[in-house]
């Protein structure tokens, strides 16, 4: 039975038991910022188990893609060396949210595993564990299912504390928890190992295939377990493990899914397809890398991106070890798509993107991999003992891009370990240097503590009345602000938009009789809106009623830029690919800035395509529509949500151009797309590894920008005595004439240098039988001096030469030694000494060297080194 067939059978079985099939969630957890990657089937249902979210179903089944690499759950260092460790795996799971409990969960599991309609596993091969005091589960297994007592094992608190057990699950020190029951498969007496709970349980004979967790208690801080009103079930069965059982193999790498990837890896590398751990590493890592990139992660030096980079570089190193020539890793993506693309369509849709990202990362790492490996070999050759020092590990990380675990991998192959504590000390020292070099600012919002919330009126109006419910000065609550004092005003209701979602806060003023407070910015803490500004006149007190007026012109310009940002986001996905995700934005009245995930610079023709798409939507002049709904309905309509953003029960969906752009957004926007008038991109560049930034302008600012550009074109045309139509031809002619003149100048300089060479040769002095010449030729560039040194070497025959020049405000130096003397005197050594005198650097071959510096006043002193240099060396 193939892996794909097992996956589908599992999903179909539970659908027949009334479960709703739920698609795998992203590897980037959308509802848990504490989690690096999705690592279990229950992650996407966490809020359901906690009672914080209600769904249309109470029974669910899924095949969840999971990654365990980095953070608490890190299998990276074991991958390739064991039969069952992976960075990526699939978790089959069925779930009950206050619906069925132990009896049904146990019966479902047993029927799926043993029924001849489904997996038809021999019952006598299955062992079961339960928590020691869970008599209910034990009785269901023995009395209702019929598992004999000799294949039942009670597991107590085997981890040194109450409820610390392999068979008791907890979400944390407090909160939902409960016993679990695990099903094991016995591979037979030919494999070493003992049953669960025995001293030999770590062997490979008895393998856990399914875990059923019964969330039945809530543990309080005092350690007491209180029964939950609606117990739930969370189960998990690794697809790779059950596939190994069904295909009668003992290693996950022997199942059909991995066999195709191993073959593809061997072909891409150009090695034999055997049992080498390095080949298993590559086959495993293509899965995690492919799926992470498909879900929007790009290689970088922090967070999820750094974990991805570590996995890619580990795969590259193991490919290099197997003899890979050039980049190979990206070539395996096609096999991954063939194997898993049907179950996970995002792989098919992102194949070209995944290949490009991997190829780019491979090529970048290849530049330092060989050099780093040589350095490591040198350090290991000098190593005394069995531990690689932390400073060596850090040097490889900091200089050559070797993640710590990659160096650890290499050390492990030599039966060495690495000094992780020493590495961390070096890292902390680097962080401290960075902190010392940083400027620190204070988060003023964090000083303001307001319990009440502000009602926002700004979607419908730019003015309204509100009551002052709090005033702050220097972060401290006050009863009054007087003329000239800066502070923060909190109202019970306001038309001012508070900074969020990339849109800056509104400005304007608050008026209460003679008192006027000029609002410079608006922010938010909790549910309270903070109006930051200064008292322009009078005094403002707590309890006063104010007329709040937003600067409507500034807000309108900001709203146009915000709407244009949404149109740009969709245009980027159409032009560059669906891998594009928003990484940040800043929208004010002057311009918009949009950061997004992409692996290379946006090409000029792509910039034009982006502008064309956005301006097309602007010309369509469609209504900008908003709708309040729940998050699941919004996602079903295709609304884009930002990863890591926490959304409430009700969300605001913003649509433009019908379904052209549909996003969750709480910002202020144009009424119609035509209000934007014009969209123009003014810059594009990189801000971090895998993150690009576009800046653009709209409306009157865009028109002014184009008018200024038109004026520059006219001025340029006048300078070359042309017009708009023939400007390019005129400029091309000027540049060609300039190239010809530069060529003529070089020829004249060469002739002048040649003539000077005849005169200079007469200025050489004799030192111990050799001619030594040092001369200053201001105005000559390095190219001319090189040619002259060559000429003088031929003319003098047995010589040491040092020429210098002041050229464009800097010192240029060239040294030469005839080959018959280069065994005794090195031109590079002379250059290092001379360049140091003029505050620069230099070097080169024994017979020819170049250098320079910035201290023109010391040039003569540098040239004077030639004679003593020759005297000492001859």
Curated annotation (Swiss-Prot):
Keywords: Aminoacyl-tRNA synthetase, ATP-binding, Cytoplasm, Ligase, Metal-binding, Nucleotide-binding, Protein biosynthesis, RNA-binding, tRNA-binding, Zinc. Its cofactor is Zn(2+). Its EC number is 6.1.1.7. It catalyses: tRNA(Ala) + L-alanine + ATP = L-alanyl-tRNA(Ala) + AMP + diphosphate. SUPFAM superfamilies: Class II aaRS and biotin synthetases (SSF55681), Putative anticodon-binding domain of alanyl-tRNA synthetase (AlaRS) (SSF101353), ThrRS/AlaRS common domain (SSF55186), Translation proteins (SSF50447). Zn(2+) binds at residues 562, 566, 665, 669. GO terms for biological process: alanyl-tRNA aminoacylation; negative regulation of DNA-templated transcription. It is found in: Cytoplasm. GO terms for cellular component: cytosol. It is an enzyme of class 6 (ligase). PROSITE patterns: AA_TRNA_LIGASE_II_ALA. It comes from the Bacteria. Binds 1 zinc ion per subunit. One of its GO terms (molecular function) is alanine-tRNA ligase activity. Consists of three domains; the N-terminal catalytic domain, the editing domain and the C-terminal C-Ala domain. The editing domain removes incorrectly charged amino acids, while the C-Ala domain, along with tRNA(Ala), serves as a bridge to cooperatively bring together the editing and aminoacylation centers thus stimulating deacylation of misacylated tRNAs. Belongs to the class-II aminoacyl-tRNA synthetase family. Catalyzes the attachment of alanine to tRNA(Ala) in a two-step reaction: alanine is first activated by ATP to form Ala-AMP and then transferred to the acceptor end of tRNA(Ala). Also edits incorrectly charged Ser-tRNA(Ala) and Gly-tRNA(Ala) via its editing domain. This is Alanine--tRNA ligase. It comes from Pseudomonas entomophila (strain L48).
């Amino acid at each position: 039975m193939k892996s794909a067939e097992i996956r589908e059978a599992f999903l179909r079985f539970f659908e027949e038991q009334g479960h709703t099939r739920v698609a795998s969630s992203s590897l980037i957890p959308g509802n848990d910022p504490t989690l690096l990657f999705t690592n279990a089937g229950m992650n996407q249902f966490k809020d359901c188990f906690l009672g914080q979210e209600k769904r249309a179903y109470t029974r669910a089944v899924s095949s969840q893609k999971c990654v365990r690499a980095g953070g608490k759950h890190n299998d990276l260092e074991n991958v390739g060396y064991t039969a069952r460790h992976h960075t990526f795996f699939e978790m089959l799971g069925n779930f009950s949210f206050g619906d069925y409990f132990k009896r049904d969960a146990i019966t479902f599991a047993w029927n799926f595993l043993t029924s001849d309609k489904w997996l038809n596993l021999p019952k006598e091969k299955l062992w079961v564990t339960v928590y020691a005091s869970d008599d209910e589960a034990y009785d269901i297994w023995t009395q209702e299912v019929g598992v004999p007592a000799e294949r039942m094992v009670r597991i107590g608190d085997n981890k040194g504390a109450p409820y610390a057990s392999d068979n008791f699950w907890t979400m944390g020190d407090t909160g939902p928890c409960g016993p679990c029951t695990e099903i094991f498969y016995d591979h037979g007496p030919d494999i070493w190992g003992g049953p669960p709970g025995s001293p030999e349980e770590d062997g490979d004979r008895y393998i856990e295939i399914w875990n059923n967790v019964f969330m039945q208690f809530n543990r309080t801080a005092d350690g007491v377990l209180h029964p939950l009103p609606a117990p739930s079930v969370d189960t998990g069965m690794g697809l790779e493990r059950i596939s190994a059982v069904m295909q009668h193999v003992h290693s996950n790498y022997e199942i059909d899914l991995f066999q195709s990837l191993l073959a593809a890896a061997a072909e891409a590398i150009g090695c034999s397809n055997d049992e080498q751990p390095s080949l298993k590493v590559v086959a495993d890592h293509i899965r995690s890398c492919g799926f992470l990139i498909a879900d929007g992660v790009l290689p970088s030096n922090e967070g999820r991106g750094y974990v991805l980079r570590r996995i890619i570089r580990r795969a590259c190193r193991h490919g290099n070890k197997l003899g890979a020539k050039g980049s190979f890793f990206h070539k395996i993506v096609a096999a991954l798509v063939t194997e898993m693309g049907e179950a996970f369509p995002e792989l098919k849709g992102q194949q070209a993107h995944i290949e490009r990202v991997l190829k780019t990362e491979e090529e970048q790492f290849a530049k330092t991999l060989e050099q780093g490996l040589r350095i490591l070999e040198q350090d290991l050759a000098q190593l005394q003992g069995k531990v690689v020092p932390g400073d060596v590990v850090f040097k490889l990380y900091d200089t050559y891009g070797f993640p710590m675990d990659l160096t650890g991998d290499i050390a492990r192959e030599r039966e060495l370990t690495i000094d992780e504590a020493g590495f961390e000390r070096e890292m902390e020292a680097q962080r401290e240097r960075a902190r010392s070099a940083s400027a620190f600012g204070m988060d003023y919002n964090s000083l303001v503590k307001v319990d009440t919330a502000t009602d926002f009126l700004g979607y419908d109006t730019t003015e309204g009345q509100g009551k002052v419910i709090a005033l702050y000065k220097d972060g401290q609550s006050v009863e009054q602000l007087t003329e000239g004092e800066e502070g923060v005003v909190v109202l019970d209701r306001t038309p001012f938009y508070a900074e969020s979602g990339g849109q800056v806060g509104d400005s304007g003023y608050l008026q209460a009789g003679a008192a006027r407070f000029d609002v410079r910015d608006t922010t938010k803490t909790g549910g309270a809106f903070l109006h930051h500004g200064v008292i322009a006149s009078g005094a403002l007190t707590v309890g006063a009623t104010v007329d709040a007026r937003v600067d409507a012109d500034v807000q309108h310009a900001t709203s146009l830029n915000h709407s244009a940002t949404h149109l740009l986001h969709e245009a980027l996905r159409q032009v560059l690919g669906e891998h594009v995700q928003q990484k940040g934005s800043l929208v004010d009245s002057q311009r918009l800035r949009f950061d997004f995930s992409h692996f290379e610079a946006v090409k000029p023709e792509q910039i034009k395509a982006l502008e064309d798409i956005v301006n097309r939507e602007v010309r369509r002049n469609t209504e900008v529509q908003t709708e309040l709904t729940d998050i699941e309905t919004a996602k079903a309509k295709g609304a884009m949500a930002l990863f890591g953003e926490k959304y409430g029960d009700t969300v605001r969906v913003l649509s433009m151009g019908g379904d052209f752009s549909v996003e969750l957004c709480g910002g202020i926007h144009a009424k119609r797309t035509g209000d934007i008038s014009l969209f123009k991109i003014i810059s594009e560049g990189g801000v971090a590894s895998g993150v690009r930034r576009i800046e653009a302008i709209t409306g009157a600012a865009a028109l002014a920008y184009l008018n200024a550009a038109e004026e520059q074109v006219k001025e340029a045309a006048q300078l070359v005595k042309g017009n708009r139509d023939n400007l390019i031809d005129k400029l091309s002619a000027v540049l060609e004439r300039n190239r010809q003149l530069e060529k003529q100048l070089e020829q004249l300089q060469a002739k002048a240098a040649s003539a000077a060479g005849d005169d200079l040769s007469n200025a050489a002095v004799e030192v111990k039988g050799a001619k030594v010449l040092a001369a200053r030729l201001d105005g000559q560039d390095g190219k001319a001096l090189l040619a002259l040194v060559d000429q003088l070497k031929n003319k003098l025959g047995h010589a040491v030469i040092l020429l210098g020049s002041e050229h464009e405000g800097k010192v240029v130096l060239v040294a030469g030694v005839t080959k018959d003397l280069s065994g005794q005197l090195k031109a590079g050594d002379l250059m290092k000494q001379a360049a140091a005198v003029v505050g620069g650097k230099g070097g080169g071959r024994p017979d020819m060297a170049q250098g320079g510096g910035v201290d023109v006043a010391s040039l003569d002193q540098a040239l004077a080194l030639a004679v003593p240099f020759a005297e000492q060396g001859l």
